[in-house]
Amino acid sequence: MKSFAHEIHGMPVHAIDGEIGTIQDVLFDPESWTVRYLEVSTGWLFGRDVLIPVDKVKRIDAPDGVATFDCTKEQIENSPNAEPERAIDRDYESRLVSHYGLAPYWAAPPEAGVPPQAMPIGAPAQVPETAEELRLLSGGEIDGYDLDAQGETVGTVRDVLIDLDTWKVSSLMADLGGIFSQDVETIGVGPVVGVDRENGIVNVSTSPEKMGHGTGEKLPFVFPYVPPLA
């Protein structure tokens, strides 16, 4: 099942032992186009936003509008705090995945025929010698990025389309018709050749002339998105 990031914004999140908050955003790797974490607002419960690895998502029931996580309230309450003044780096992510008993996704895959080693819950994940920035993007951050086709600005990125079974970002939702446009188009991430976070630009290899003339599905879109009331 596929969903735009804005469609799961505000969705209630249930832990094993009860409701914990609502989904606020998705964080994805713009190189592999894979969602790594969901940002969850715990509101009155714990009073902070937390990042939870998508590997802990048990299911997302779109018809009922509920996301169920395979972890407890206590696990979420005791999860490592992200420091607002620091970028998310390998050190923080290492502590986060270790807290949830997960293997780091950046670890090298096992050799063919050799089963991966199980990682005990609470065991420290391996951290590179330098704590490089993870360079994750959020759905909220990429909203508003310019879409640049071979040096020409052709539109504005509005959202990402996510496969909720694989957590892969398959397409970008882009407004190619200006601020007053009522139509947007989905553009596959295949032609994306780079994401310039400093200047807020997504670069694609497609020529400006071909933008808007592909197989992208025309979709009704209202901006800004207002999540349904809980």
Spell out what each predicted region is.
Residues 1-230:
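Peripheral interaction segments used for macromolecular assembly
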